[in-house]
C-alpha cells in the first residue's frame, strides 16, 4: 500500500488510512488565509510519518554544530511585548545551532541553506526560533516540508544523497515556484557557501506577533546580524576546503571559541502593525517573501554572544530539540501555514527524545508545573494527585500557578470562514522578489549566480529537467536564462524560445478587451503547432483572464523578447525557431508593451514611450524600426502612440541597433 501511495507524477496520492485520493499539494484551512485545520488527517499523516522515519540526528539538518553563550538585551522593548527577558540589560542563557539541510551526516562544507536556530532560556521564559541564513523559506505550506527534505536526503537503495543527483534536486528545488527565491537567489548566489558560521547572518524566517500588556499587537521579523561581518566562499575555494577537511565548519567554530575568539551577533527586529501589511504589498503569513529594510528598518534589540563549546557532541548538539511552538509570554505566531508545522516538532520530540522533556540540553530552566507523570527520564515526583480538576486535593497546577501568569495571546486576524482547501504551491506573484533580487545584484554577483546555475543545470541528466529549470529562470532574468540555455544545450534553448513565444501571445489576454478574447484564444491555438508547444492551457487563460492589475508585471516580462527576436533566434536555437518568431510581427510586441504601460500606470505618461524605445531595439535588429512603428501608428491598434513616439524611435534607430547588438553579445558570453 505504501509503495502505491503516490500516483506517478500526479498531484494526488492515496491516503493509507482512508484509502481515498487526496490532493498532495493542498491543505485544509479556515478560510483562504486562516489556520490549518486538525481534521485534515491526510496532511498530518504525511507530516507525522516523516517525524518517525529515521533517528532524529540522521534526518533533517544532520550535519550540525552548536555553541552556548548569553543573550543581553540592549533596550527595553517591553512596550511591544510582555516577555520577561526583554527588559534592558537582562541577560539569559542562549544557544545557537547551525546545520546544513542536505545529506545525512556528511560534510557541512557544501553549498546549501544553513540553519540558524536559537534557544533563549531563563527561569521565567523560554523562546526558540528556527530559521536559516536567508530571510525566507523554501515553501509556504508545511505539507511540502517532507517532500523538500526527501529531495536532499539519502536514497533508500544505496544511501547516496538525492541532492547528488542534480536532476532530482533541480526538480524539487529549482522548478517548484515558491522555492525559486530561496534556492536560486540565495543559495546559488553565494549566501549558502558561507565562509564560516561565525560569518553568517541568521533570520527567524517567520513573522511573529508580539502582544503587549495592554493587549495591543505588533508583528516582528527577527534578524541575527554577524558582528564579525558576513562572508562567503567562491565555489572553487569551497570545493578545495571540503576536500581537505570535511568537517571544516565544525572545526573552525570549535577552534575559534576554544581560543577565546567569541562570535557576536546583533539581534534585530522589524516591528510592524497589521496596518503596515495593508499599506505595503507584503503578507505576514507568507514566509517566502522578504519585508525590505527600506520599508521597515531594523531595530537592534540585543546582543548574542557564543562563548562555550559543547562538551559532548551527541548529548548537547545531536540531542538538542528546537520547537517553534516554544514561546515566552507575549509572543505568538501569525496564521503562517508553514509555522504550523509546530505539531511535527513536538511529535518528533515525543517519539525520539522521551515524553518528559528530561534531556538536560532540552530541559527548560523554568520550574515545570503540570499534571503529567511517567515516561522516560521522568523525575518530577510530587505527592499530589495528577488529575485536574479533582475533588480530593489540588493539583500541582492549581496550587502553584497564579492566574496572572497565563499567556496573553492575540485574537485571530482573520475571522472564521469555513473549511477551504488551499493549494500549497500557488501564491500570487512569487517571482516578483526574485526579479528584484536579480536587479539589485552587481554584475560580478550576477555572473556567479549564472555560473552556479550553469553547473547545476548542466549536471542534470534529464533534458526535461534542464528545460524546466531554464524556462522557470527565464521568468525572472531573461538574458541570464538565455546564457544558461546556451550552455546546457539545444533542448533547453529551444524550449526557452517556445515558452517566450507562448508568453507573448498569452500576455495579450491581460490587455485585450473582453470582445477580443476569443480571437486571441483562436490565434494562440492556431499558432501552437508552429512553435511545437501544447498551448491549450495558455489559451484557456486568455478566456478566463480579467486581471488588469497584472499588466505592470506583464510589461516587465516582455524584457525577455530581445533574445528571442528572429534576428538572433537562429544563433541561439535553430532556423526553424527564427521562422516561428517571425510569424508574430515586432510591431505587435511594441503595441502590447505600450498598452501595458498606458493601462497600468496612466499617471506615468513616459512609460509607454520608454517601452516603445526599448522594443524598438527588436525591430532595429531587423533594420526596420521606423517602418514598423509607422505601420503601428497607422493601424492605431491601441491609441497610445503619437507622432512624438514615431519621431523619437526613428531618431534613435541607429543607437537602438547598437545597444541591441551589445546585449546579444553579453547574452552569449562565455
Swiss-Prot record:
Compartments, as annotated in UniProt: Peroxisome matrix
Catalysed reaction(s) here are: 2 H2O2 = O2 + 2 H2O
* UniProt record, GO biological process: hydrogen peroxide catabolic process; response to oxidative stress
**By its UniProt entry, which SMART domains does this protein fall under?**
Catalase
Q: Give one Pfam hit by family name.
A: Catalase
Its needed co-factors are: heme
Which EC numbers characterise this protein's activity in its record? 1.11.1.6
Per UniProt, which keywords does this protein have? Answer: Heme, Hydrogen peroxide, Iron, Metal-binding, Oxidoreductase, Peroxidase, Peroxisome
Give residues annotated as binding heme: 345
Q: Which GO terms describe its cellular component?
A: cytosol; peroxisomal matrix
Catalytic site: 61, 132
Recorded GO molecular functions are: catalase activity; heme binding; metal ion binding
Q: How does it assemble?
A: Homotetramer.
Q: Which family does it belong to?
A: Belongs to the catalase family.
Cited function: Catalyzes the degradation of hydrogen peroxide (H(2)O(2)) generated by peroxisomal oxidases to water and oxygen, thereby protecting cells from the toxic effects of hydrogen peroxide.
Kindly provide the name given to this protein in its UniProt entry: Catalase
* Species per Swiss-Prot/TrEMBL record: Penicillium janthinellum (Penicillium vitale)
Amino acid at each position: 500500500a505504501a509503495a502505491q501511495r503516490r500516483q506517478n507524477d500526479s498531484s494526488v496520492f492515496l491516503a493509507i488510512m482512508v484509502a481515498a485520493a487526496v490532493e498532495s499539494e493542498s491543505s485544509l484551512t479556515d478560510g483562504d488565509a486562516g489556520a490549518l485545520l486538525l481534521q485534515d488527517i491526510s496532511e498530518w499523516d504525511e507530516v507525522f510519518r516523516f517525524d518517525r522515519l529515521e533517528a532524529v540526528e540522521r534526518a533533517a539538518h544532520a550535519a550540525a554544530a552548536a555553541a552556548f553563550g548569553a543573550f543581553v538585551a540592549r533596550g527595553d522593548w517591553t512596550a511591544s511585548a510582555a516577555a520577561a527577558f526583554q527588559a534592558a540589560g537582562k541577560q539569559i542563557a542562549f544557544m545557537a545551532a547551525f546545520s546544513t539541510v542536505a545529506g545525512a551526516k556528511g560534510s557541512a562544507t557544501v553549498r546549501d541553506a544553513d540553519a540558524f536556530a536559537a534557544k533563549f532560556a531563563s527561569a521565567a521564559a523560554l523562546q526558540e526560533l528556527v530559521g536559516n541564513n536567508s530571510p525566507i523559506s523554501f515553501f509556504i505550506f508545511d505539507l511540502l516540508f517532507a517532500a523538500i527534505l526527501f529531495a536532499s536526503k539519502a536514497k533508500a537503495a544505496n544511501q547516496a544523497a538525492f541532492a547528488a543527483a542534480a536532476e532530482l534536486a533541480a526538480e524539487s528545488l529549482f522548478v517548484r515556484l515558491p522555492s525559486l527565491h530561496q534556492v536560486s537567489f540565495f543559495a546559488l548566489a553565494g549566501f549558502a557557501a558561507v565562509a564560516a558560521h561565525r560569518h553568517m547572518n541568521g533570520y527567524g524566517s517567520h513573522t511573529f506577533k508580539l502582544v503587549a500588556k495592554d493587549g495591543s499587537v505588533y508583528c516582528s521579523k527577527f534578524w541575527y546580524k554577524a558582528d564579525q561581518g558576513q562572508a562567503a566562499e567562491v565555489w572553487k575555494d569551497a570545493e578545495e576546503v571540503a576536500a581537505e577537511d570535511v568537517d571544516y565548519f565544525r572545526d573552525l567554530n570549535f577552534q575559534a571559541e576554544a581560543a577565546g575568539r567569541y562570535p557576536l551577533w546583533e539581534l534585530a527586529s522589524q516591528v510592524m502593525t497589521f496596518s503596515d501589511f495593508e499599506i505595503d504589498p507584503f503578507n505576514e503569513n507568507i514566509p517566502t517573501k522578504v519585508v525590505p529594510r527600506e520599508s521597515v528598518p531594523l531595530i537592534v534589540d540585543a546582543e548574542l554572544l557564543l562563548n562555550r563549546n559543547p562538551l559532548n557532541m551527541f548529548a548537547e548538539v545531536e540531542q538538542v530539540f528546537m520547537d517553534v511552538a516554544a514561546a515566552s509570554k507575549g509572543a505568538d505566531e501569525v496564521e503562517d501555514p508553514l509555522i504550523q508545522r509546530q505539531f511535527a516538532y513536538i511529535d518528533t520530540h515525543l517519539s525520539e527524545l522521551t515524553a518528559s522533556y528530561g534531556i538536560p540540553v532540552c530541559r527548560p530552566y523554568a520550574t515545570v508545573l503540570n499534571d503529567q507523570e511517567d515516561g522516560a527520564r521522568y523525575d518530577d515526583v510530587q505527592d499530589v494527585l495528577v488529575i485536574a480538576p479533582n475533588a480530593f486535593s489540588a493539583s500541582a497546577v492549581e496550587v502553584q500557578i497564579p492566574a496572572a501568569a497565563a499567556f496573553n495571546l492575540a485574537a485571530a486576524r482573520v475571522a472564521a470562514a469555513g473549511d477551504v482547501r488551499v493549494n500549497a504551491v500557488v501564491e500570487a506573484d512569487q517571482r516578483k522578489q526574485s526579479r528584484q533580487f536579480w536587479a539589485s545584484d552587481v554584475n560580478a554577483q550576477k555572473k556567479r549566480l549564472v555560473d552556479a546555475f550553469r553547473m547545476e543545470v548542466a549536471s542534470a541528466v534529464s533534458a526535461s529537467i534542464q528545460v524546466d529549470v531554464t524556462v522557470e529562470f527565464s521568468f525572472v532574468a531573461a538574458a541570464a536564462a538565455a546564457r544558461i540555455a546556451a550552455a546546457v544545450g539545444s533542448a533547453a534553448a529551444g524550449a526557452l524560445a517556445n515558452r517566450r513565444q507562448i508568453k507573448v501571445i498569452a500576455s495579450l489576454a491581460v490587455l485585450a478587451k473582453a470582445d477580443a478574447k476569443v480571437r486571441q484564444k483562436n490565434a494562440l491555438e492556431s499558432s501552437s503547432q508552429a512553435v511545437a508547444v501544447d498551448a491549450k492551457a495558455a489559451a484557456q487563460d486568455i478566456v478566463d483572464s480579467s486581471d488588469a492589475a497584472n499588466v505592470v508585471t506583464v510589461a516587465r516580462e516582455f524584457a525577455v523578447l530581445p533574445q528571442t527576436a528572429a534576428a538572433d533566434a537562429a544563433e541561439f536555437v535553430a532556423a526553424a525557431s527564427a521562422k516561428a518568431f517571425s510569424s508574430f510581427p515586432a510591431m505587435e510586441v511594441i503595441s502590447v508593451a505600450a498598452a501595458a504601460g498606458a493601462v497600468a500606470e496612466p499617471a506615468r505618461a513616459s512609460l509607454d514611450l520608454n517601452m516603445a524605445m526599448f522594443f524598438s531595439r527588436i525591430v532595429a535588429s531587423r533594420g526596420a524600426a521606423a517602418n514598423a512603428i509607422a505601420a503601428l501608428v497607422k493601424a492605431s491598434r491601441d491609441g497610445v502612440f503619437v507622432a512624438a513616439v514615431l519621431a523619437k524611435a526613428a531618431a534613435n534607430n541607429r543607437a537602438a541597433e547598437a545597444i541591441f547588438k551589445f546585449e546579444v553579445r553579453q547574452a552569449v558570453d562565455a
